[in-house]
Amino acid sequence: GIAWFSDFKLEEGTKNKSNNWNVACLIMKNIDTKLEDGKTLKINMEPKDVDNIKSNMERFKSACKTLTDGKMTVEYDTYEITEPIKTITYSDEYGYYIDPSDVESIVTPYLSKKEYDYIFVAVRLGDLDKNIEIPVYDWIGLRRNGLTWNRIFKYKIAK
């Protein structure tokens, strides 16, 4: 194949010598949207779901420190967001997934509070106990045009 760069710009930044990651964990507790087939998807997280997410985040925090022998640490802010997600994206390749555009207006106020190195968005897309299941073919992460989501928001907030 052939590849090339166009409109390439090299900028100088400041080196951050900190080994601590500032992470935002956004727990999106509710979805209320129409699916491609016209059906309504309405899911609300239960307290046990939120507790499970918080427990996993604590394990992530301790695992980063342990696995790097203290060379990387994590501090995070957790935001429980009750405003429902009104759209979710669908593609034949991936099924349903949360695209940054689906939640951007909801999460931007939280992300503008401080600078984050990484963003976790926790969403429940199904509930087997209630027989709610939608096709999700792969975990694809929150990216847009090959850029990590937090970089997009830093750019938009800075403008």
Name the predicted role of every residue range.
Residues 1-16:
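Extracellular and organelle-lumenal recognition/adhesion modules and their flexible linkers in secreted
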Residues 4-6, 21, 146-148:
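Residues that flank catalytic or metal-binding motifs in active/ligand-binding sites
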Residues 15-139, 143:
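Propeptide-to-catalytic entry region of secreted or membrane-anchored zinc metalloproteases
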Residues 146-159:
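Short pre-active-site segment immediately N-terminal to the catalytic Zn-binding motif
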